[in-house]
Structure formats: structure tokens, C-alpha cells
């Protein structure tokens, strides 16, 4: 086996396989996290902006199972999937939720969102976009939660995506950014994917 194939995790690829094919053929640890998460809890705050319009729409349109928990008190989604159920209290969340929380809030609210996720029984947390503030990451670790990722959008690691996200994901794969390992250090240079 060639040196190149050994470096690709013993992948059995034709020597002339284009780089884009090689990039897409390899799986990423974050793919496993999001694709096997079950019904994760998406924590956001509608008083801070567009949440849950964009996120709710993206996850709903791809058939992903999730429960949306809004710290801002909004009980129905807005945007492309208006009217979908949004929870405002942890005690109202269905029992079949998984142990993964995706945090999509501004940094000033992130530590509170982590506490709410922990109250919901979540043991793992994924900070989407700019939500991975150092204080929130420290709070998650203090509560014994596993920090899965700081900065990247989980939609990029789903099997199915809405067209705009699919195009963005292809660009990330071609650029090499998709393959970077999960970021769990809040002090590292940020690799946010917007």
C-alpha cells in the first residue's frame, strides 16, 4: 500500500483519485456525533436575533430529530418553517431527547444556555458559531459536560442538507476546512464557519 493510502487511514483508493473525492470519502468525528445524536436539544435565545428561524428551518427541512428550547420565550418557530413547536421550559421537553445540546446563542448568554442544557439532562455540548465563549466552555466542563465542538455549524455534518448548506459544505470540503479536527479549546484561534 502506498504511503498516501496509509496516511488516509488505510483507504483503498485508486492512485489517481481526485483530492475532492478523497476528502469526501473520509468520515469526520463530528459526522458521527451529529448523525447518531438522536433527538438533540437545540438551545437558543430568540431575544438575541434570528433564532429559531434559521436553525429550526435547517434542521426541520433535513428531517433531523431535535427539540428547540428558546431562552427568549418564543413558543413557535418563525422564518421558513413558521409555527413549529418550540419549548420554553426544560420540564416541557419530551423525554426521548438525547444527551447532546447544540448551543446557538450570543456569547453573553452561553453560560446560561449551558446550565439549561445540563438541566435538560445533556452531557455533551456543541457550541455553534460564536457561542463558544470561554466562560461557557468553562461552565460546561465544571458541570462535567463533554465539549464536542466550539465554532462549527452542525448542519455541515448532516447526511441531508438544504441546498445553500450543501453548497457551503462542498466548499469547506474542497478547501480542507471540513477535515480539521474538532475544536475544543476555547483559547485556540477560532475556526468559525459562517
Q: What is each PLM-predicted segment?
A:
Residues 21-23:
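Short, positively charged and aromatic/hydrophobic N-terminal segments
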Residues 38-52:
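Glycine-rich adenosine-cofactor-binding loop
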Residues 57-79:
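NAD(P)-binding Rossmann-fold cofactor-contacting core
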Residues 79-95, 102-111:
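Glycine-rich, highly charged phosphate/nucleotide-binding loops
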Residues 96, 134-157:
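Short acidic, glycine/proline-enriched helix-loop-strand junctions
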Residues 120-139:
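ADP-ribose/adenylate-binding Rossmann-like module
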Residues 157-194:
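A charged, well-structured terminal subsegment
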Amino acid at each position: 500500500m502506498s504511503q498516501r493510502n496509509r496516511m488516509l487511514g488505510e483507504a483503498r483508493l485508486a492512485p489517481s483519485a481526485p483530492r475532492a473525492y478523497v476528502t469526501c470519502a473520509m468520515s469526520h468525528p463530528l459526522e458521527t456525533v451529529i448523525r447518531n445524536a438522536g433527538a438533540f436539544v437545540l438551545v437558543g435565545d430568540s431575544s438575541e436575533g434570528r433564532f429559531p428561524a434559521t436553525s429550526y428551518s435547517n434542521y426541520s427541512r433535513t428531517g433531523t430529530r431535535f427539540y428547540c428550547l428558546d431562552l427568549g420565550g418564543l413558543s413557535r418557530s418563525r422564518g421558513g418553517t413558521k409555527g413549529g413547536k418550540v419549548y420554553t421550559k426544560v420540564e416541557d421537553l419530551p423525554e426521548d431527547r438525547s444527551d447532546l445540546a447544540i448551543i446557538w446563542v450570543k456569547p453573553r448568554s452561553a453560560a446560561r444556555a449551558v446550565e439549561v442544557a445540563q438541566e435538560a439532562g445533556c452531557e455533551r455540548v456543541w457550541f455553534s458559531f460564536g457561542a463558544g465563549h470561554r466562560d461557557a466552555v468553562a461552565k460546561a466542563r465544571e458541570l462535567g459536560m463533554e465539549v464536542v465542538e466550539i465554532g462549527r455549524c452542525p448542519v455541515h455534518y448532516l447526511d441531508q442538507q438544504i441546498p445553500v448548506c450543501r453548497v457551503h459544505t462542498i466548499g469547506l470540503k474542497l478547501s480542507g476546512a471540513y477535515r480539521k479536527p474538532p475544536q475544543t479549546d476555547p483559547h485556540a484561534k477560532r475556526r468559525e464557519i459562517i
